[in-house]
Amino acid sequence: MMTVTLQDSSASAVIEARRTYNEKLSRKTDQTRATWFPLALLALLAALPLLQFVGNYNYVLHLVLFTASYVAMASSWNILGGFAGYVSLGHAVFFGVGGYFSGMLLARYGISTLITAPLAGLVAAAIGYGVGLVTLKVRGPSFIISSIALLMIARILFDNWHFIGGANGLTLPPNDLTVQWAKLPYYYAMLAIAAFTVWSAYKIKHSKFGLGLRALSKDEIKAESAGIDTRFYKVAAFALSAFFVGMAGAVWGEYLTYLRPNIFLLILVSANMVLMCILGGKGTIAGPVIGAILIVALNELFVATMGASEINILGTGLVMAIGLMFFPLGLVGTLARSGKLPRILNWD
């Protein structure tokens, strides 16, 4: 009897060890594939401008640059809205702050925004920290309304601030490159900002700080009773979120060669960040990236078929509404919950 028991115990131990080994191997495979895919995608996009040697692909570069800007902004918004659970519709303010700060340095002192973008991000983060100290005392609908009020105040201020051009805006000098290569510096800069933002979001999510953010998004009172300084965590998340948006705004301003409040300080810019995260999967790493790609692609499709009017916005909205009926947690979130997420999109 004892021999049988020992044999059974030994067999169980072997089976358990084998199962543990298989799980470790599976996790390692997932991690390898999840690392391989975004790096391969980044390398492919970095090589894309080589197409300019065989033809004019400026529009393709513009689309990638535009998408990369929203990847950066949506991933940045995800730090506050996805991890901490605070939905802000005022993040276009930091897009404008970054654009105007670096744009003014370029217009008056000739310093390229490619150099001053990190500084613009820090200015946006400092303003975000100050704003967060005030607005993050409330949450839910009250916080959303306060973020919209912030955007409205900023729009009035920028429209009437003659030092930065007022409502007429400010024209920025173009670079000295030929038309074929003029987009190249901004293309690589925005690609780098997008990659850095996604990587930072991943690091934040898997840090002690990120764990605290996710805890307070579930139950802020319980998180505070567990010893988490919820006010600091929220304000820090707000500042970090503003930092990356400010950098994207800095590069976008010089790329356009002009700054106007009706371009930067639009609620549509903030809404796009939110919608991209929701469509892709709020709180995930790959979600904002997938959401940005899908919404930009849908918008371009509807503009091409329906023209540049509000109808294309309606079309994009309808597709999103239908999509969320089938993917209530976003594309990445729903597939991950059901265990059907492709390994190449498992970036979490």
Feature roles, as predicted:
Residues 2-348:
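Transmembrane alpha-helices and adjacent helix-loop boundaries
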